[in-house]
């Protein structure tokens, strides 16, 4: 049975304005808040970002250093940047603090991105037609009816 507390999460990575990696799935744990859900989702995105960074290095592509994740939840950003545990985060499984470690070590950067500009939204929730068309265009997906 699907629990609404097991939130779907997603990410998309772009290189030279083209989507090169994307994912959407239900989180493996039940998050107790939207902050926690976003934090957990960005941990998975961090793993993918670091892997893509290593692939780009291997291919000798010029990439922005360090990789940047755009997050629409300021509390999740603060949680990842603050290495001090507090009551709201002490129950989060240790494996999900990987993002915090990578931020602390300078391997990844986190930037706030308003929800209106989140490209992965189309993967995780129903969107209206105008929003869908915006996301499709930003992801570089062509409208087959206009070919």
Question: What is each residue range found by the language model?
Answer:
Residues 1-147:
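Divalent metal-binding acidic/histidine catalytic loops
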